[in-house]
Amino acid sequence: MAKKILGYIKLQVKAGSATPSPPIGPALGQRGVNIMGFCKEFNARTENVEKGTPLPTVITVYQDKSFTFITKTPPATHYLKQITGLKSGAKLTGRETVGEVTRTQLREIAEKKMKDLNANDLEAAAKIIEGSAKAMGLKIVEA
């Protein structure tokens, strides 16, 4: 018989650096999950990912206090900041431009993120990434 699900916890955890401190500790502690067990398993599973990369994580907590988790690809903004070398996006979105990104670069990001995006094809995925780039204050240029 399948385990009964108690709930889901969505967190953004940096690869290879899960610790019992906030926000992980309190979020898991409220559900009675073994915090150190999660941290060790997460760090082991993400050791091949560049340390410090933010990974959206969905933790499924079961009634017997056991858990499973899924890590997704890093956010589009992480890839965009990596490509442009920016620390953050524009403070006044739409009014100021902080950098440029090419359509080819957008397509590369879309390929990496395809499995996590709600898009049927690469063109639709690239448009989603383009929207994120514009929201960050990046100018899209043809290349």
From Swiss-Prot:
Keywords associated with the record: Methylation, Ribonucleoprotein, Ribosomal protein, RNA-binding, rRNA-binding
Maturation and modification: One or more lysine residues are methylated.
Key word Signal present: no
GO biological process: translation
One Gene Ontology CC term in the entry: cytosolic large ribosomal subunit
Pfam families reported for this sequence: Ribosomal_L11, Ribosomal_L11_N
InterPro entries xref list: Ribosomal_uL11, Ribosomal_uL11_bac-typ, Ribosomal_uL11_C, Ribosomal_uL11_C_sf, Ribosomal_uL11_N, Ribosomal_uL11_N_sf
Record GO terms (molecular function): large ribosomal subunit rRNA binding; structural constituent of ribosome
Record flagged with keyword Repeat: no
Description of how the protein assembles with itself and partners: Part of the ribosomal stalk of the 50S ribosomal subunit. Interacts with L10 and the large rRNA to form the base of the stalk. L10 forms an elongated spine to which L12 dimers bind in a sequential fashion forming a multimeric L10(L12)X complex.
Entry's family note: Belongs to the universal ribosomal protein uL11 family.
Function: Forms part of the ribosomal stalk which helps the ribosome interact with GTP-bound translation factors.
Protein name per UniProt: Large ribosomal subunit protein uL11
Species per Swiss-Prot/TrEMBL record: Caulobacter vibrioides (strain NA1000 / CB15N) (Caulobacter crescentus)
Encoding gene (name): rplK
